[in-house]
Amino acid sequence: MSFYNHKEIEPKWQEFWAKNHTFKTGTDAEKPNFYALDMFPYPSGAGLHVGHPEGYTATDILSRYKRAQGYNVLHPMGWDAFGLPAEQYAMDTGNDPADFTAENIANFKRQINALGFSYDWDREVNTTDPNYYKWTQWIFTKLYEKGLAYEAEVPVNWVEELGTAIANEEVLPDGTSERGGYPVVRKPMRQWMLKITAYAERLLNDLEEVDWPESIKDMQRNWIGKSTGANVTFKIKDTDKDFTVFTTRPDTLFGATYAVLAPEHDLVDSITSAEQAEAVAEYKRQASLKSDLARTDLATDKTGVWTGAYAINPVNGKEIPIWIADYVLASYGTGAIMAVPAHDERDWEFAKQFGLDIIPVLEGGNVEEAPYTEDGAHINSDFLDGLNKEEAIAKMVAWLEENGVGQEKISYRLRDWLFSRQRYWGEPIPIIHWEDGTSTAVPENELPLVLPKTSDIKPSGTGESPLANLTDWLEVVREDGVKGRRETNTMPQWAGSSWYYLRYIDPHNDEKLADEDLLKAWLPVDIYIGGAEHAVLHLLYARFWHKFLYDLGVVPTKEPFQKLFNQGMILGTSYRDSRGALVATDKVEKRDGSFFHMETGEELEQAPAKMSKSLKNVVNPDDVVEQFGADTLRVYEMFMGPLDASIAWSEEGLEGSRKFLDRVYRLLTTKELVAENSGALDKVYNETVKTVTEHIEDLKFNTAIAQLMIFVNAANKEDKLYVDYAKGFVQLIAPFAPHLAEELWQGLANTGQSISYVAWPTYDESKLVESEVEIVVQIKGKVKARLTVAKDLAPAELEKVALADEKVQAEIAGQTVVKVISVPNKLVNIVVK
């Protein structure tokens, strides 16, 4: 029996594509352009897992489809290769992170090529290549020139075990680091910051212009966190000092019964009374050990200490105590809040815990029992009494401005981006600090500032990066004899990934980041597919840099990615015992359809779970390609379910996809192909072209494959196959199973050319309609025959056809036909006696 011999066919076509540069990006000015982008991977030592190809296959299907539709297609791949794991490996083994990275890239590339993706490898980029990061550094120098890159003494999330500070986004809810799970402490350090806040409003508004999942847009909106309210100034009793709070509800100011400052607030030490000094100092120390996430966790008990000082509520002159509490962050808002415990859950809990006043200023609820957080008419609020929320806010803001104690203010949750890392394996920041106190950017003609090779890459221990140990590189002298020291911090991994999609457009340009005309031709990216875990950070950072480059006149569009799609997660299988503990797959055996612990014999429950090394349930694509073939893996991952759903990996599903490809191979290599169309497959073929085309456009790959299966089933029922339909079908399956399609195409067309650029099939609308229908013939109410007749046949004609049928004649022999009821396109009912 003939079958698809993947071990022979797949390497053959991969070699053909590489040799012929089949997927070189088209540059025909007459054709439209299509840019399909994958989130490029970090080349880890573990290599690809089966989750990677899901997104890659989706963009590959679109790329192959668009080439066949006559587009120039840009479909590139590269490597996000700076980052902590390579550095950690180098520290553990004494090897150079560059060598480790190069080996990993070679392995990733081998695996990717084995899956038949149609990348244009002439455009490969690597963020650790000096010819690439020259332009990462160039962008930084431009940010610096425009005042958007600046140094500040900021409390950072310091991870002792990693020897570096990490961004807020890299701290887990339990207060440990995302990488390694190490404790995170807050400590002030000199850091480079990027002023992403200058773009907050545009980052928010321009989300309206892109075709992204609403859930991702919402995550970005929440991260930017725009709120309109007022800044209110509180004077501190018996001093000339004051502080400002931002509130979205200035109308509740009459209910403010205490104020809270962040433990790090500048005023804390100077306003604390002698009696409270010790308690305040100890509380500040404890707060410094917690991450922002741990501090703001709503589920934890509130803690705080009174400073001994009082503020004056500007609206009624009342003295209110000033506390410090770690749920107020110095980095958020003004680092100070006014507390209205009657109408805010956190303030209410705090007030109850420490016996502070609770004064209701909105009607409704019993604030002794619980805070009232709904809207209501104002009470206990002097000139606001009886007003609703909108009226009261407007009136209070006017009062604050009139009395010089506040003004309307728009605030954002978004903070400036902490851009420095105290590590070796990253882009050097191209800044020199001179002994006269000035700093300058490295001039453009001296870029790239190359990362020096060194075997000593342990953190310096001083909070500086290992580059601080490299004196020859570190120390420089200006022409006028002034000595300087290079910046020792390096950029975060996010830097290179914030603009890589631009370099793919013109990867070998030595003169500029990319040519303007080429950027105009290819931007914005038509489709960007990757994991939802990058919803906020990578996408927000890339949008920020893109907008900055737009302002410089470097890029022609306001947004980088027109359409974004997040593929779901491919889950592994996990097993749990009766206590709910997870059992590694190599300790599990299957008996009679159930699963048992090999050592204890206990029956286990099977459930999907994220693939992980510890559970030993990670599936390696190399093994799948070896056993089933790359086309099977591609078809299976697209057929598992909707592209954005998270679905459990299944060996049975893989086998099913393999059987389907074998059936396709058999159909097209053993069925007699004829030049004359019998018309039997007209409807199903045209339906298949229509459905597959529309569903590829809509990224509904699972239902496109289901339609291909319907065609194969229908074609197998016929004795012969019309050759044009055979060719059309092979073209339709080519984006999903390209190796198989190339092989079958040579059998059909025998041109020696790839199927990749053969024009995509079209369908005939008129053939989508049935010209014949099946009707049933009933005698005495029972179905005795099924007949195929012309559609819309008149009742009298229908009756003739039914009565002439042999089966029907045999059934009514010797009986009298009393009446015949004919319903066109449905049935003929014969009444006999």
UniProtKB/Swiss-Prot annotation:
Q: Which InterPro entries match?
A: aa-tRNA-synth_I_CS, aa-tRNA-synth_Ia, Leu-tRNA-ligase, Leu_tRNA-synth_edit, M/V/L/I-tRNA-synth_anticd-bd, Methionyl/Leucyl_tRNA_Synth, Rossmann-like_a/b/a_fold, tRNAsynth_Ia_anticodon-bd
Q: Which UniProt keywords apply?
A: Aminoacyl-tRNA synthetase, ATP-binding, Cytoplasm, Ligase, Nucleotide-binding, Protein biosynthesis
Q: Map motif 'KMSKS' region onto the chain.
A: 610-614
Record's Gene Ontology CC terms?
cytosol
Reading the lineage from the top rank, the first entry is Bacteria
One BP term from GO: leucyl-tRNA aminoacylation
Entry's localization field: Cytoplasm
Coiled coil regions in record: none
A molecular-function term among this protein's GO annotations: leucine-tRNA ligase activity
> Into which EC class is this enzyme placed?
ligase
Q: What is its EC number?
A: 6.1.1.4
Which stretch carries the motif 'HIGH' region? 41-52
User: What reaction is this protein's catalytic activity?
Assistant: tRNA(Leu) + L-leucine + ATP = L-leucyl-tRNA(Leu) + AMP + diphosphate
Q: What positions does the entry give for ATP binding? A: 613
Task: Please state which protein family the record places this protein in.
Answer: Belongs to the class-I aminoacyl-tRNA synthetase family.
> What NCBIfam families does the database record attribute to this sequence?
leuS_bact (TIGR00396)
The name under which this protein is listed is Leucine--tRNA ligase
